[in-house]
Amino acid sequence: MAVAGVALALLGSCGGMTDQEKAMIGKYYISAVSDTHPLLELGEDNKAVVRAIRPGELSFSVEGVWHVRNDSLVIDNDVSSIAIEEGDPSLVGTVAEHVGWPIKHYDETTLRIERAGIIYDYHRRMN
């Protein structure tokens, strides 16, 4: 009985969000790309939505699960969840099932990450 209790406690401690992840929950925008749709949504229970937008051509989103691991934002995308919001679906191309982006800086309003050698500032809105 005690062994079962310890096992349940260990399983429970593996789940949930870290304090850092809880602090990062929100919708993140790059206003040069879109002021109306967040490019990154980091939700409760580690649910994520990543949006790709090429203004006037294509906009789509994919759902996934996110975590912060080793100072990186890691997202496991569910590629079956791709939703076309605007444009031709044949333009989507390949969506990565797993991404990891180094976090360069984080505060209450800005998440700075590195993607393919380029630094991006995502601005969080509390809406």
Positions of the model-derived regions?
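Sec-dependent bacterial lipoprotein signal peptides
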Residues: 1-12
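Lipid interaction determinants
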Residues: 14-127
